[in-house]
From Swiss-Prot:
HAMAP family: UPF0735. Belongs to the UPF0735 family. Residues 70-145 form the ACT domain. It comes from Clostridium beijerinckii (strain ATCC 51743 / NCIMB 8052) (Clostridium acetobutylicum). This is UPF0735 ACT domain-containing protein Cbei_1295. InterPro entries: ACT-like_dom_sf, ACT_dom, UPF0735_ACT_dom-cont. Pfam families: ACT_4. CDD domains: ACT_PheB-BS.
């Protein structure tokens, strides 16, 4: 019985649509195209396929430096909360590589954070759930993994 929401699967056994979605995302990320319409045309998929899978398909790579994950976190703008988030990550063994907080609007702040997972105690699911359990953290969105 499997637990968790993520699987690592060799792309050779999956329909090619998933790899095409990744290709379209890469075209956009690298700035080779500016519009989704252009990216999906080059990748050979429909816009509906792109929108259906874009938030669920990620490229996975193991590097010599370790695994890196990027999150987008929405939290109530409260004194000390950013510190609580960073303390939680370091307590779990994570190394914060980049952190960028947007200007708080309507009482909420947006945080983009990249973490080196190579020394984290536990798995990515546990880390994500722990971030969600921090008081006044409203949303933790998994952006990607390298």
């Amino acid at each position: 019985m499997m637990s968790g929401d993520y699987l690592v699967i060799d792309k050779r056994v999956l329909p090619d649509v998933y790899e095409k979605v990744l290709f379209a995302k890469k075209l956009l990320k690298d700035g080779k195209v500016k519009e989704i319409t252009e990216a999906v045309k080059i990748a050979g998929i429909s816009r509906s396929v792109y929108y259906k899978y874009r938030d669920f398909v990620f490229d996975f790579a193991e590097t010599s430096e370790g695994r890196k994950v990027t999150y987008n976190i929405i939290f109530k703008n409260e004194k000390g909360l950013l510190s609580n988030i960073s303390n939680y990550i370091t307590e779990k063994g994570g190394d914060i590589l980049t952190i960028n907080q947007g200007i708080p609007l309507n009482g909420y702040a947006n945080l983009s954070i990249t973490i080196d997972l190579s020394t984290v105690d536990g798995d990515i699911k546990t880390l994500t759930e722990g971030l969600l359990n921090i008081r006044n953290v409203e949303k933790v969105e998994f952006i990607g993994m390298e």
